[in-house]
Every structure is written in structure tokens, then in C-alpha cells.
Amino acid sequence: MREIVHVQAGQCGNQIGSKFWEVISDEHGIQPDGTFKGETDLQLERIDVYYNEANNGKYVPRAVLVDLEPGTMDSVRSGPFGQLFRPDNFVFGQSGAGNNWAKGHYTEGAELVDNVLDVIRKEAEGCDCLQGFQLTHSLGGGTGSGMGTLLISKIREEYPDRIMSSFSVVPSPKVSDTVVEPYNATLSVHQLVENTDETYCIDNEALYDICYRTLKLTNPTYGDLNHLVSLTMSGVTTCLRFPGQLNADLRKLAVNMVPFPRLHFFMPGFAPLSAKGTQAYRALTVAELTQQMFDAKNMMAACDPRHGRYLTVAAMFRGRMSMREVDEQMLNVQNKNSSYFVEWIPNNVKTAVCDIPPRGLKMAATFVGNSTAIQELFKRISEQFTAMFRRKAFLHWYTGEGMDEMEFTEAESNMNDLISEYQQYQEATAEDDVDGYAEGEAGETYESEQ
């Protein structure tokens, strides 16, 4: 079957990663000890995508857990599903990366990376037909961002034809751990642009706003933010884990979602959003789900899709509902808001339906958008980066680990290029002379098609 190897790196990556495993284990009827106690065969039909069936009939996640300090790993191990993971798949150092990208990417992380690759190789060898990898990490710290991107490029070297997907938590001044987050994030994006096929941008600022505004939490904790992330991750992987036709593997998703190789940063959304504990008392209709799902307030990235245009969209509906109604509602949204979808990619919205809803809900919908409005998120980081970099603030922490200022300059300009590429396609119309306005990607793809 088509397996996915999951890697989680750093504190944030391990926290949202282990939450992801709790949620999907629950959805597939896998107990914390790895035994199956589910209700239907649907839960097992594609279980091998994420789990390995051991000799004793227990299911073991195809997960590799990485960190440069033991703390977070210990709490995962002592957590509710800690015994589910393969003990050999915990790989950790003792030094920590101290929120320094250079330590994660060049020094401390580089020392540990071969051990991690050994474990990843072992997992990959246990696969029948590996489709690709998914990494959970944050871009603001040292390990997830620095070592996470190092792992991505090493995996890319060894498995060049496999899909690489990442769930990347983008830093925000509202929920900030460290002052150097803009540096770490920019250096990471510089890597992700080149080395991932699909990146889900999960943005602490958006999560914070959802908790505060929609869920009415006055002091959102990381636990609350991670609860939202796990809903989203469970939603966007539904098609990969349950039987179905559309976007049923990582590559098909990439083919549908990525019109130009560098523009692979997605904005996820989820509906219905209701405060943790007070699950919606009434089931929403398909129309309400669709409405909510496209609402800017439900986006997990702090960008307003109304400030840009959608290149492509994928929507996943979960629960028992009429396919016809789903199709009607999705067409309805596109017709009413046609100006927000680029007209030069016809049929750029794809919909999938899965019968099994998430726990506690009758129906739910997950949204994945490739919108040019994502440039707002990169602009925000870029401005903060430039403010500090102009004064060379905090640079000694990075140059002390052997980095060169040149690398900062390159990362900065790569991110600014990305922003202007999004802008260029936002303004493009179907009538534009394709060769003329884009010497780069659009021109090439256009010529090669003929």
C-alpha cells in the first residue's frame, strides 16, 4: 500500500505531532496500546498508510520523533499515547538548539542527523510502496526550523522522487517565544521553497485569533492552539487515510494544488469551529459548513483570502451527507465569488467526501487553499526580519555557529521573490501574454505544453 513516514522535530513539532497521532488513532480505533477496537472495516482499510502492523497484531505508527533535548520527548513518552510509538524511533540530543536556527541546521542538529536518517531509512524499508514523508515542525525555534529543514534536504537527497509535505507552524508576535523568530522563519522558508512539495502554513496568530474571537477563550494556551492544529491535520489527511477517490495520495494532492513549483504554501481552514468541550449542539447544514469553511475567520493562516485570489482549492467534507448537495454548495460559492478564483485555471476547486466524521461531530469540513493572499504572512515575517537585519541585531548568535551574513541576505531575497511571484499571479488574467509577463515559470510551462 502507499505508506507515509511521519517525522516530528523540535518541541512544537513533537507536541502537534503527538496530538495528531492521538486524534487519528482515535479515528481508526487504535487503542493507546496499539490494539484495534474499532467499529467498522473502513477504519482498517487504509490503516497501513500511517501504521505498521507488528507481529503481535498491534499497530505501530510510522513515526520518527526528533529533538535536540530530551524534555519534550519525555512528556510524549509519558503522555496518553506514549507507548504506541516504537521506542527506537525516539532520537534526541542533550544540548538543545536554544532557538537558534544555525545550531539546528549546521552544528548540533548536523551531529544528530545521521542517527535520525538511520531510523527514517529503517521505516522506509518497512514500506511496501512509500509515497512520501510528512514533517511537523515550527519555523520560529531552533530544532524544528533548523534541523527540520536539514532533515528535509537530506531526505530529498536520498528519496528524490518521493513527495515531501510539511505542517509548518509560522511564528507570530502575538504568541511569541523568542525575539529571533523572524530570522529562524526566514531561513526556514528559504529551504521550504526549494525542498517541499506541499507546505501547510499553520499560523499561531490565526490560531490565537480563532481561540480568542470564535471560541471566546480569554487566555488561549498552547494546548488550545494545538487542539485546532490537530483538527486541521486530521482533516487534511482524511483522504489519505480513508478509502476514497479524490486526492487519495500526496502526489495527487500536489498535482491538483500546485500550479507552479515554488507556490506550494497552503492555507488550511476548518468548520465547524466551536469551543473545546462545547461541541456544536446542532448539526450544521452543508450550506453552513461551506459558508464557514470559506470564511476568513476560519483560516489557520493569518491572511485574508479576500485580499488575494485562489489559484486552487481542495475541500474535504466528513460525515453522512448528500454528494449532490455538497457539489451544489461548492459551485454556489464559486459562482458568487468568482472574482476570488483565478479564471485561467478552470475547475480549480476539488471536493472530496468521507463517510467517517471526526469525533464528536456529525459533519465537518476541512479547507485547503492555495491563495495568493498567503503573501501577507510572508510579508509580515519579512518586515520583522528586515527591521532586525538592518541593524545586524542578534547576528552574532548565528555567525558564531559558522553562518555567513550572505546566507541571511539570500534568504531575505528568496522570500521577497516568493512574495512578488504570488503578487504576479494574483494580477494575471487569462488574456495576458504568458511569455511576456513571466520570463520564468509560466513561460516555460507554457512552451513545453505545445
Curated annotation (Swiss-Prot):
The annotated consequence of gene deletion is: RNAi-mediated knockdown abolishes recruitment of microtubule end-binding protein EB1/ebp-2 to a wound site. Almost completely abolishes induction of nlp-29 expression upon infection with Drechmeria coniospora.
Q: What is this protein called?
A: Tubulin beta-2 chain
List the Gene3D superfamilies. Helix hairpin bin, Tubulin/FtsZ, C-terminal domain, Tubulin/FtsZ, GTPase domain
Give the residues the record marks as binding GTP: 11, 69, 138, 142-144, 204, 226
Q: Name the domain of life this protein comes from.
A: Eukaryota
Keyword terms: Cytoplasm, Cytoskeleton, GTP-binding, Magnesium, Metal-binding, Microtubule, Nucleotide-binding
Chief localisation class? cytoplasm
Q: Where does Mg(2+) bind?
A: 69
Assembly and interactions? Answer: Dimer of alpha and beta chains. A typical microtubule is a hollow water-filled tube with an outer diameter of 25 nm and an inner diameter of 15 nm. Alpha-beta heterodimers associate head-to-tail to form protofilaments running lengthwise along the microtubule wall with the beta-tubulin subunit facing the microtubule plus end conferring a structural polarity. Microtubules usually have 13 protofilaments but different protofilament numbers can be found in some organisms and specialized cells.
Q: Which Pfam families does the record match to this protein? A: Tubulin (PF00091), Tubulin_C (PF03953)
**Any GO CC annotation of this UniProt entry:** tubulin complex
| Biased amino acid composition, Acidic residues | 429-450
Function, as annotated, reads: Tubulin is the major constituent of microtubules, a cylinder consisting of laterally associated linear protofilaments composed of alpha- and beta-tubulin heterodimers. Microtubules grow by the addition of GTP-tubulin dimers to the microtubule end, where a stabilizing cap forms. Below the cap, tubulin dimers are in GDP-bound state, owing to GTPase activity of alpha-tubulin. Required for the normal dynamic behavior of the non-centrosomal microtubules in the epidermal syncytium. Involved in the redistribution of microtubule end-binding protein EB1/ebp-2 caused by wounding.
- PROSITE patterns in the record, alphabetically? TUBULIN (PS00227), TUBULIN_B_AUTOREG (PS00228)
One example GO MF annotation = GTP binding
Name the gene for this chain.
tbb-2
Q: What is the effect of changing residue 404 to E?
A: Partial reduction in ced-3-mediated cleavage
Q: Which organism is it from?
A: Caenorhabditis elegans
CDD domains the record matches = beta_tubulin
Post-translational modification remark: Cleaved by caspase ced-3 in vitro.
Which InterPro entries does the record cross-reference, listed alphabetically?
Beta-tubulin_BS, Beta_tubulin, Tub_FtsZ_C, Tubulin, Tubulin/FtsZ-like_C, Tubulin/FtsZ_2-layer-sand-dom, Tubulin/FtsZ_GTPase_sf, Tubulin_C
**One GO BP:** mitotic cell cycle
Alphabetical list of PANTHER family matching this protein: TUBULIN (PTHR11588)
